[in-house]
Each structure stands twice: as structure tokens, then as C-alpha cells.
Regions:
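Conserved short strand/loop->alpha-helix "switch" segment adjacent to the catalytic nucleotide/phosphoryl-transfer site
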Residues: 33-55
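Conserved polar catalytic motif of the HATPase_c/GHKL fold
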Residues: 56-60, 64
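A short, flexible helix-to-loop-to-beta junction within the catalytic ATP-binding CA
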Residues: 65-70
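A conserved short beta-strand within the histidine kinase catalytic ATPase domain
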Residues: 71-81
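Glycine-rich/acidic phosphate-handling loop/turn and adjacent ATP-lid/helix
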Residues: 87-112
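Glycine-rich nucleotide-binding loop
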Residues: 98, 131-138, 144
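ATP phosphate-binding glycine-rich loop and adjacent ATP-lid/helix-beta elements
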Residues: 103-128, 132-133
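C-terminal end segment of the histidine kinase catalytic
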Residues: 143-150
Length: 150
């Protein structure tokens, strides 16, 4: 069985599917960054925000989605660019089981801040958790006040 991730890309869309592991998460992150550079031609600052927040969603798949499974699962990254609306949407999904973390003190150094990071970096963050899996959708406007955005 081939464990290498699969990729489909065009100027408006990117789809990547692979094992929910750290190596694949890194490869999906690199593919997303290249796609953003080539297809969207956005500023480095906006790209960095997108890649950082999507990396957090990928890391959550790796760390949490299949924790109670005996087999390694998969994750999917789907990105789209709407030039008319000047927006980018990226969804990361898995078929695992998401468990809301127990509340922790805000100053607890072990507290996860990933969801807050995604919410801060994206213009809109939606997390849909179902028994059949979890999908995180992150939406960004490319018409930010960043003067280097093309």
C-alpha cells in the first residue's frame, strides 16, 4: 500500500489527501505554501497567516483525530481561491473522533491555544465535529490592508 499523499492542484483549487502523520502534515503544509505562491500571488504576510493556521488544523488531525483508533487514519486539505471575491477558503478534515479538551486555566503552560490561534489568523473559523469526523474551515480575505498583496 502506498502511503504517499495524493495531490490535485490548479490555479483555483488544491486538494491533498494523505496519512494523518507528522511527515504528511509537513508535506501538505509545503504544498499549500507553494500553491498560494503560484496560484494566488499574495503577500508573504498573508501566506504566513494562512499556512500557520492551516498547520495548526493539520497538527490537530495528527495529534487528536485518531487517538482512540487502532489504525492510522487519513486527513484531507482542500483549498480554493475565489478571485472575484478575493477570498481563500481552506478546509482540513479527518474521519476521526474529536473530543473537546477539558477546560484549563488560561495561564496553564500546557493549555492548547491552537483553536484560538486559528480564530485569530483567519477571518472566519468553523469547526464541525461529527461522529464520522471533524472538518475545520478557515476563510481569509485577500483584500486585507496589506500593501504588498497583489
Amino acid at each position: 500500500m502506498d502511503d504517499s499523499p495524493s495531490f490535485v492542484a490548479d490555479p483555483a483549487r488544491l486538494t491533498c489527501v494523505g496519512a494523518a502523520d507528522a511527515i504528511t502534515a509537513a508535506e501538505l503544509r509545503r504544498r499549500l505554501d507553494r500553491w498560494l505562491q503560484q496560484a494566488v500571488h499574495g503577500s508573504a504576510g498573508v501566506r504566513d497567516d494562512i499556512v500557520l493556521s492551516v498547520n495548526e488544523a493539520l497538527a490537530n488531525c495528527v495529534e487528536h483525530a485518531y487517538r482512540s483508533h487502532h489504525r492510522r487514519g487519513t486527513m484531507r486539505l482542500q483549498a480554493s481561491f475565489d478571485s472575484a471575491a478575493q477570498s481563500i477558503s481552506v478546509c482540513v478534515s479527518d474521519r476521526g473522533r474529536w473530543h473537546r479538551p477539558a477546560p484549563q486555566r488560561p495561564n496553564d503552560p500546557r493549555a492548547s491555544r491552537g483553536i484560538r490561534l486559528m480564530q485569530a489568523l483567519a477571518d472566519h473559523c468553523t469547526i464541525n465535529a461529527h461522529p464520522s469526523g471533524t472538518t475545520v474551515c478557515l476563510d481569509y480575505t485577500t483584500a486585507r490592508s496589506d500593501p504588498t498583496w497583489n
